[in-house]
Structures are given as C-alpha cells and as structure tokens.
Amino acid sequence: MHCPFCSATDTKVIDSRLVADGHQVRRRRECLLCHERFTTFEGAELVMPRVVKQDGSRQPFDEDKLRGGMLRAVEKRPVSMDEIEQALSKIKSTLRATGEREVTSKMIGNLMMDHLVNLDKVAYIRFASVYRAFEDVSEFGEAIAKLQNDKSKSGKS
C-alpha cells in the first residue's frame, strides 16, 4: 500500500481489527520511510443490483443516496449511527438476496420505510411524507393514524 504522505511503497501493518460486525478490517499502518501513521479499511466489494427509477431509467445503486435519505429522516432524532448502519446493511443484504440484476426504486423506498418504522416513528413519517409526496395535512394524519392502528394491533403500548 502506498503511503498517502510520501507515496512510498513500503508500509507495515501495526494493528488489525474487525469492524462493522466483522464485514470490514480496520488496519493501522506505518510508513517505513517517513514514519507517518494512517488507517485503512478493507471490505469485500459486493455487486449491487441496478435501480430502475419510476420514469423507467436505470442507474447504479448508490449507497450514499440511501444513507443520505435515512440521515435526513432521522436528523435530530434519538437514533444512533450504529442503528442507522445496521438498517442500511440489512436493506443492502435484502436487495442482494433478491438475486435480481435490477430492483425498482419503489422496492428500495418500501424497504427504507420498513426499517424506519422500527427505528423511529417520527423519522418514518418524515420519510413517508417525501417518498409518498404528501400534498396536505390530512395525508400526514392518515399516516399517523395508520401507525397508531398498527401499534394497537400488534399489542404494543
């Protein structure tokens, strides 16, 4: 691995440990020439299906877009980064598990809502309001009423 400070090709690994539930390896490295230390992360590159948008166009899966949508929904809510990363990981695993080369943006949106409803109800309503393009206050009321009905049916208080 090249040193990011002096571009030397000789570096040594000082420490390695598993992170992200064992899906990544974090390595502390030291350059043998300039003695600067830096961190690298190593993970398997998994092929994600392409996304078919509502207008029929196709584009590569964009994890940053998925993460951005979730972060906007949970902004200023009591949801930890670990919970967010776990939800994103589960969504990606579900998409890969379909075995399909292409998935619809609608499927991704529904998976996002399924995870948000379990993480934080307010974040779920925020995301649903944009995803389902709520036009007026009554649609918010309907979504909230549905959440409350689902809560009472599941026996939670």
Swiss-Prot record:
A biological process term (GO) from this entry: negative regulation of DNA-templated transcription
UniProt signal peptide: none
Residue intervals of the ATP-cone domain: 49-139
Cysteine disulfide links: none
A molecular function GO annotation: ATP binding
A Pfam family that the UniProt record links to this protein: ATP-cone
Keywords carried by this UniProt record: ATP-binding, DNA-binding, Metal-binding, Nucleotide-binding, Repressor, Transcription, Transcription regulation, Zinc, Zinc-finger
Co-factor binding details: Binds 1 zinc ion.
Cofactor: Zn(2+)
ZnF (unnamed) intervals: 3-34
Highest taxon, organism lineage: Bacteria
KW Zinc-finger (keyword) present: yes
InterPro entries assigned: ATP-cone_dom, NrdR-like_N, RNR_NrdR-like
Keyword Repeat set for record: no
Function: Negatively regulates transcription of bacterial ribonucleotide reductase nrd genes and operons by binding to NrdR-boxes.
NCBIfam families in alphabetical order: transcriptional regulator NrdR
PANTHER family, alphabetized: TRANSCRIPTIONAL REPRESSOR NRDR
Family: Belongs to the NrdR family.
Record's protein name: Transcriptional repressor NrdR
Lineage: Bacteria, Pseudomonadati, Pseudomonadota, Gammaproteobacteria, Alteromonadales
